[in-house]
C-alpha cells in the first residue's frame, strides 16, 4: 500500500516475520532526499521506541527496509492517543542532535513565507480543470483567505512580516505528523510513521 508518492510493500521472510520495503520517488522527479531524511530521522528517534526500526537502505536504488509493525489504523482518537503524540513531540526536542538538522520540507519561519506557500498551493489547485473546485477556490476560499490575511496583517507585530523565527525557537518536526500516519498496536501503544519531511519548523505550524 502506498502512502503519498512512495510505494510500500510487505515482504514475508517466513510465516511469523515480515519487513517493510519502501520505494521512494525518483530523485529526478522529486529532488528532496526523502529516503535519507527518513532513515536519519528514524535512527535519531529510535531510542524513544515509538517508530519502526531501520533494517537496511540503499542510496543508489533509493529504497529502504524497515521493521514491520503489527497493528491497525487509528479509527477513534482517545485522550491517551493524544498524550502519546504530545509526549513524542516533546521528547524529540530533548535529543542532542537537534540543532544539526536542516529545515523540514516546506517549513515556514515567517508570515511572508507562510503566505507565499499558501498562494503557491492555491495556484496549483487552480490549474486543475474542475468547475466545482475552481468555483470553490475563486468564490469561497479566496475571499475568505483575503479577509483572514488582511486581519492577520493588521494584528501582526509591525515591521515583522518578513522576520524569520530564530533557530532557538524552532522545533524538530516530523512535518506530516498525525494519527493518519500512526499504527495502533494491540497493546494500545502508537507507532508513528512517515518521516520523509522531518526537520526544523515553526512549533505553531
Role assignments for model-derived ranges:
Residues 97-175, 186:
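An alpha-helical support segment within catalytic cores of ATP-dependent transferases
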Residues 178-180, 184:
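Catalytic-loop Lys-Pro-X-Asn motif of eukaryotic-like protein kinases
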Residues 28-29, 73, 182, 200-202:
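Conserved protein kinase catalytic core
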Residues 172, 184-205:
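Active-site Asp-x-Gly
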Residues 5-119, 124:
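ATP-binding pocket architecture of kinase catalytic cores
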Residues 70, 179, 197-199:
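Short, glycine/acidic-enriched loop or turn micro-motifs at the edges of active sites
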Residues 17, 62, 169-171, 189-191:
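The start of beta-strands in P-loop NTPase/AAA+ ATPase cores
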Residues 1-2:
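Protein kinase glycine-rich loop
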